[in-house]
Amino acid sequence: RVRSSAASDVYKRQGRPYHSDPEINHGIDTLITSLGLCVLTEDSVANQVEAKRPLRVVDQWVFHARLYAAAEFVGHHDNLELIQLNSFGCGVDAVTTDQVEEILSSYGKMYTLIKIDEVNNLGAVRIRIRSLLASMNKRLAAKNDESNDGNYGINKKIFTKEMKKDYTILCPQMAPIHFELLETAMRTAGYNLVLLRECTQKTVETGLKYVNNDACYPSILVTGQMIEALESGKYDPNKTALIMSQTGGGCRATNYIGFIRKALKDAGYPNIPVISFNVVGMEKVPGFKLTIPLLEKLLRGVLYGDLLQKMLTKNRAYEKNKGETQALFDKWMEKCKEILKNGNSKEFKQSIYDIVNDFEKIELDTSIEKPKVGIVGEVLIKYHPFGNNFVADLLEKEGAEVVLPDFMGFIKFMATHKVTFNSLLRTNPIVAKISKAAISLIDILEKDSKEALGKSKKDYLPPCNIWHLENTVKDILSIGNQTGEGWFLTAEMIEYIEHGIPNIICVQPFACLPNHVVGKGVIKTIREKYPNANISPVDYDPGASESNQ
């Protein structure tokens, strides 16, 4: 019927399933039919064709796969057009809208996106639909098939073994203390990795230029850093690669690499390879291997970062001699880098005790007890000073002691995923056992740190026991909540409260869907369980004013 229908027919993708509700879509489907057009939903045609793969994005959701197939179907029919509905603030659709647009553009089709919110005035929508109809009729009359071959695939430049020798690998900033140490660890393995340390307002503007503005703030920051570095002229585009972590979870972070590849293409650097740093086998990168020695050094770097972070925030808040803590911190950063380069296990172990003992000598003025404020939230925003508007510095200036969670805790949380999958879904017991063993090895690595901190008189927060944290949240939410920071974010808040830190700032990017559930969504329940809890959620985005935060 579609092939024989009149040229005025239009295919309208109904958005997400709930967009079929007239109370939500404000009667847009009725408006379309009133213009003499037919309406089809994406699920009515998605089974007719398959989208060409591999796609630029990670196609991990059934609904998203239907969208891409529906867009492909529309591309095959001259008398069909597509209208995509999405809800205002639906960050997940920042991934789908770009990909659907690319598919349609490859067939010479106009992409129309209509954002749905509580406003029900359809005047502007009527104009957009009429414009779409006029464009379709004009295209049909012209019968111009140039460049409409449906080629929307992306040419992924692979980082080869040969590239390892002379390529510079650019890494975006996330956690300044930890990533400076991880840069050293990567260099010892033969990778010429350069950490992009600085972020400015220009970085944000660059990110906004090349990334869908509905994507989350961290994706805008990291992409902006990379493109800004390439445009600076410091790096040869023919000898440069980029690296980005990829968790494989449901968070948009899994698609950061897709965002980056699109930005590279749009900025004129399509031949720069992007390395996926992951341990779940998402992308094969011949020139980058996570060997056991490299993993061990990376974990040591994270442990050093966690320990130095504790030393810095605790002692800086109370030091008698201003600047003494920072000077000692800088000294130990260099020592830790040297041990990561050339040290052995014995030197690493001894350095843990030496760090704590050295910082123990710093005299503190504890005549006035300062309120402790814990920072939790999305993993980049809580550590990245520019990303959170330097909230730690602000709190210290206001007379608070800042407490930041261990980065290693997040790594252990990620390792629990396969264990949870197996316990709830009976997936793969062997992988679950391997994950448990990995967590046990990390606990062994942290043993000296726990012991050294336990001997200190300065009340440091010890490294977390991930299984204990998991148990603390089971009466609040399911441990099946693994997207983004998942149940671990809730557990971090409870851990702080149980350690006498009831004042908590929960930071997240604007429209971070996981944090709506495991962050903001559990605050009321936590307050009911812990009446002394003082939790304040703060959103960050490229345009948020500091005064609002």
Where are these regions (language model features)?
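Long, well-ordered, tryptophan-enriched scaffold segments
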Residues: 294-348
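Glycine-rich, anion-gripping cofactor-binding loops and their flanking helix/strand elements
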Residues: 46-92, 205-234, 249, 477-499
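Short connector loops at secondary-structure junctions
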Residues: 37-59, 116-123, 194-212, 275-286, ...
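Single conserved hydrophobic/aromatic residue that forms the stacking wall/gate
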Residues: 1-7
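Extended, H/D-rich, highly charged conserved domains that either
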Residues: 12, 18-20, 365-369, 374-453
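Short helix-loop-beta junction
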Residues: 25-42, 104-107, 184-192, 266, ...
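Active-site rim loops that border cofactor/substrate pockets in soluble metabolic enzymes
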Residues: 29-30, 37-69, 435-490
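Peripheral docking tails and interdomain loops at the edges
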Residues: 75, 86-160, 165-169, 261, ...
